[in-house]
Amino acid sequence: MSGGLVTAAYIVAAILFIFSLAGLSKHETSRQGNNFGIAGMAIALIATIFGPDTGNVGWILLAMVIGGAIGIRLAKKVEMTEMPELVAILHSFVGLAAVLVGFNSYLHHDAGMAPILVNIHLTEVFLGIFIGAVTFTGSVVAFGKLCGKISSKPLMLPNRHKMNLAALVVSFLLLIVFVRTDSVGLQVLALLIMTAIALVFGWHLVASIGGADMPVVVSMLNSYSGWAAAAAGFMLSNDLLIVTGALVGSSGAILSYIMCKAMNRSFISVIAGGFGTDGSSTGDDQEVGEHREITAEETAELLKNSHSVIITPGYGMAVAQAQYPVAEITEKLRARGINVRFGIHPVAGRLPGHMNVLLAEAKVPYDIVLEMDEINDDFADTDTVLVIGANDTVNPAAQDDPKSPIAGMPVLEVWKAQNVIVFKRSMNTGYAGVQNPLFFKENTHMLFGDAKASVDAILKAL
């Protein structure tokens, strides 16, 4: 395949990737967007494999077969509830790939390049390895937090921001040494020291972020992985990799910014680490009143006598796989003429759009799934609210307690409804480790047990 044909294929693939992003932005066109992405990636792979600069095609095809087999295995094995962990670990692979490409590019650069081109190449290598290493360890820590292997509580080291700044300054000085020196030994030493600093830097950035803010972390790491891919594209002189990486990097950054705005948080604090950890309260498990319990049968009667119902799902619904019976309850209540809607918090679940994906999977009509800003004013006129597996996103302490770790975060104001039913396994705190005063309000009743079992019991009673 000639160079011109490869370039043309790359342009087509890049356009398909843009169409893919546009399609994925809406529920109605998401399947079409996914197909555009698959087509673009297929064209990109074929053009790269059979391009004029590619050798050892057999090894590449073998690697593709192995990678494809692993991907198919994961796609069949991983549940929807484990998708955040899968996304995080895939981000780490992108970062690790950028690191390996960087070292390979340094060891096998073209001899006889002009000095200015050599400096540009070395800068590309250095930045590519730095971004890749930060993405790799940051994503591994995010994976550990999401699957419970690492504590979700933020790592609060003294002077952590000064440590982050020092790491950046030292890395910048190492970049100058790496580019300016002619000594191969000194270059390798600078590269290895920077890699070690970047690995620790990435680990510390994510470790210092509170568990409740993991959806923002996932979108932030998505952005980092995009820039790591773009850096690899520069090192490999691959235009499509640069374009694709820039698309992923910018879209991830925009998504992080939108989510931060929705949570009343500073975008810079996400980049710097320590997001959502400024509150002095530790959020202990101490109860702040007496809670009231309710049965599934009583909940069913309450729903039958309601005119308006809002369901606010959280990660607990995902874990229990309760979206299917919830969809059936919605269908039954709507058949009775009851106005049923869903209120989705921007960071409900463990990755952006987590609840929307689960509800779409259960075929809940998309026009009754509303964002927090669209539905918050309606709670006061609502008869019954079902809080299924949500905790921090419906916590009134965000508004009432300035010392709370989640202070200032906009929440779904479910307590304004006439009746609130909270589905929980126990009275334990949520992912942020903060007690929820909602559970002790007079209009709130607790329905304890597995969310799916509770929803099934309500469905049977209906």
UniProtKB/Swiss-Prot annotation:
The protein's matches in Gene3D superfamilies, at most eight in alphabetical order, are given as: TPP-binding domain
Membrane side Cytoplasmic: which residues?
A: 25-45, 104-115, 186-188, 237-239, 330-462
GO CC annotation: plasma membrane
UniProt topological domain (Periplasmic) ranges: 1-3, 67-82, 137-164, 210-215, 261-308
Q: Which reaction does it catalyse?
A: NAD(+) + NADPH + H(+)(in) = NADH + NADP(+) + H(+)(out)
Is Cell inner membrane found in the keyword set?
Answer: yes
Statement: the UniProt record of this protein carries the keyword Cell membrane? yes
The record's Gene Ontology biological-process terms are: NADPH regeneration; proton export across plasma membrane
As recorded in UniProt, its EC number(s) are: 7.1.1.1
| Main location, first listed in the record | membrane
> What are the recorded GO MF terms, alphabetically?
NADP binding; proton-translocating NAD(P)+ transhydrogenase activity
Q: Where are the transmembrane segments?
A: 4-24, 46-66, 83-103, 116-136, 165-185, 189-209, 216-236, 240-260, 309-329
Give the bilayer topology: Multi-pass membrane protein
Keyword annotations for this protein, in alphabetical order, are: Cell inner membrane, Cell membrane, Membrane, NAD, NADP, Translocase, Transmembrane, Transmembrane helix
Q: Where in the cell is it found?
A: Cell inner membrane
PANTHER family named among the record's database cross-references: NAD(P) TRANSHYDROGENASE SUBUNIT BETA (PTHR44758:SF1)
Q: Which family does it belong to?
A: Belongs to the PNT beta subunit family.
Which NCBIfam families does the entry mention?
PRK09444.1
What does this chain do?
The transhydrogenation between NADH and NADP is coupled to respiration and ATP hydrolysis and functions as a proton pump across the membrane.
Q: How does it assemble?
A: Heterodimer of an alpha and a beta chain.
Protein name, as recorded: NAD(P) transhydrogenase subunit beta
